[in-house]
């Protein structure tokens, strides 16, 4: 088995999908989880205005709506959380995503004060954060806020990780990578677009250039620039297609060096890191 085949198998990626079937699969997955653990009353998700959180948010609200109708349990809710750092450049996209999702509840937590306070505390301890590390601080502060909300609403935190993100480890460890349940896992980027199109999402929300937008020195830096490879390349690779040798090498290098991000903390029983 080639490394490409191993990666595809590990991430559960498929070369082709039926959008309606995958929508149903994710919604039923969320419903089943909530029914298995009836003490869970809410799904909590940060909404950025990008493709992934828009899709995950819509699926969460669909699952909650169906469960309420089927069980009569009105205590179930989906909580969409806006988590800007100061003023967000694409705020209108966030509002458009909220309008599309129609969440039960919307909360806004501006993380700038908390991030700056943490940075100042570290500075006083003699640690000056780089812009890159400050970006990770933002991602972790966002997740911290979501877990606080989940803790106060008997909820779980929903993630947006998918195959095209997992393969490169393009998330912050214990930031946006630290969640309870990931309904998009297995899909690549173009497949996520197919699901949103089938759901009637406004096109500008999934046709915009994806960006983590964590660095102050490089605002709205496109993911594809940061990764050195396009999502079309990544999706082709995940679909088992032949890609240029340099593209495959770049993707595989990302995969191998970020393996620790896709695993629990390393113990004496692990040996993957020795390879």
UniProtKB/Swiss-Prot annotation:
SUPFAM superfamilies reported in the protein's UniProt record: Adenine nucleotide alpha hydrolases-like
UniProt GO MF annotations: ATP binding; glutaminase activity; metal ion binding; NAD+ synthase (glutamine-hydrolyzing) activity; NAD+ synthase activity
CDD domains with a match to the protein in the record: NAD_synthase (cd00553)
Pathway assigned to this chain's UniProt record: Cofactor biosynthesis; NAD(+) biosynthesis; NAD(+) from deamido-NAD(+) (ammonia route): step 1/1
Organism: Escherichia coli (strain 55989 / EAEC)
Sequence similarity: Belongs to the NAD synthetase family.
Catalytic activity: deamido-NAD(+) + NH4(+) + ATP = AMP + diphosphate + NAD(+) + H(+)
Function: Catalyzes the ATP-dependent amidation of deamido-NAD to form NAD. Uses ammonia as a nitrogen source.
UniProt name for this protein: NH(3)-dependent NAD(+) synthetase
Binding site for Mg(2+): 52, 165
Enzyme superclass (EC): ligase
A Pfam family: NAD_synthase
One Gene Ontology biological process: NAD biosynthetic process
Domain of life: Bacteria
Residues engaged in binding deamido-NAD(+): 140, 173, 180, 260-261
EC number of this enzyme: 6.3.1.5
InterPro entries: NAD/GMP_synthase, NAD_synthase, NH(3)-dep_NAD(+)_synth, Rossmann-like_a/b/a_fold
Keywords of this entry: ATP-binding, Ligase, Magnesium, Metal-binding, NAD, Nucleotide-binding
GO annotation, cellular component aspect: cytoplasm
NCBIfam families xrefs: nadE, PRK00768.1
Keyword Cell membrane in record: no
PANTHER family membership: NH 3 /GLUTAMINE-DEPENDENT NAD + SYNTHETASE, NH(3)-DEPENDENT NAD(+) SYNTHETASE
Residues where ATP binds: 46-53, 160, 189, 211
Subunit and interaction comment: Homodimer.
């Amino acid at each position: 088995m080639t490394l490409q085949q191993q990666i595809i198998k590990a991430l559960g990626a498929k070369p082709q999908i039926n959008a309606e079937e995958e929508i149903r699969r994710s919604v039923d997955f969320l419903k089943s989880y909530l029914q298995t653990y009836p003490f869970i009353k809410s799904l909590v998700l940060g909404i950025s205005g990008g493709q992934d959180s828009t899709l995950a948010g819509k699926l969460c609200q669909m699952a909650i709506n169906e469960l309420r109708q089927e069980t009569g349990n009105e205590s179930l809710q989906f909580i969409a959380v806006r988590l800007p750092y100061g003023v967000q450049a694409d705020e209108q996209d966030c509002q458009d995503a909220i309008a599309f999702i129609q969440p039960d509840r919307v909360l806004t937590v501006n993380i700038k004060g908390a991030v700056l306070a943490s940075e100042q505390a570290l500075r006083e301890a003699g640690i000056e954060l780089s812009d890159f590390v400050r970006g990770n601080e933002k991602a972790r502060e966002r997740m911290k806020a979501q877990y606080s909300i989940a803790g106060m609403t008997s909820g779980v935190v929903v993630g947006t990780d998918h195959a095209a993100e997992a393969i490169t480890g393009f998330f912050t460890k214990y930031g946006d990578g630290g969640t309870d349940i990931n309904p998009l896992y297995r899909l690549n980027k173009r497949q996520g677009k197919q699901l949103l199109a089938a759901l009637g999402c406004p096109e500008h929300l999934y046709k915009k250039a994806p960006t983590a937008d964590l660095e102050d020195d490089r605002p709205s830096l496109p993911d594809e620039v940061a990764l050195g490879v396009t999502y079309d390349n990544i999706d082709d690779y995940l679909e088992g297609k032949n890609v240029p040798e340099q593209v495959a090498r770049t993707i595989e290098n990302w995969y191998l060096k970020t393996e620790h991000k896709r695993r629990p903390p390393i113990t004496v029983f692990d040996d993957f890191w020795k390879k």
